[in-house]
Amino acid sequence: SSDLHASIRPVLLTGKEKESAPESFETIKALGKDFKGYYFRIQVNTLDCQGCGNCADICPAKKPALIMRPIATQNETQVPNYNYSLKFSYRGDLTNRFSVKGSQFYQPLLEFSGACAGCGETGYAKLLTQLFGERMVIGNATGCSSIWGGSAPSFPYCTNQDGHGPTWANSLFEDSAEFTYGMFLGHNQQRQRVVELMTRDRKSVV
């Protein structure tokens, strides 16, 4: 799933969870040794889909797995289905995070931005958050990505269940490389200071 705006989610269910699902919540047996005993579904959040059609155009399945339909024909079934899928945690720990398939089972920490429908930037940013999101530090250059990425009061970068997520800042001046390098140096300085304090005080800790 390209999941450009995080409105498409891969879902893994146990047999018991599948039995409790709405009747329209169709699943198939999940493929791969990592997912033995699980059932798989791609769930669309119709209320946040922007209707660009990119996902349907590039879906790699031999038989089209994503088909565009008028939203009015989908909300009645897909909204309850999406809400049901939210009851279960992401199951990325079952597989290799740093693979195309495995990365998609990690929570995207970029959700429902105000970017234009079909934006080519958000898919990459969303994938980065699935790979490194809980420890990402972003120094955003000024441009489209700073508008959809940080226009008050909307902020699409979010946190996981532990409260961890990307740190984001933007410099209006055309110095994003220097600006972000300064963030890197400051981070290293803080870490070094912690090491110095711990080293100095370790003998006094009972």
Placement of each model-derived feature along the sequence:
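Alpha-helical scaffold segments in soluble metabolic enzymes
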Residues: 54, 126-131, 193-196
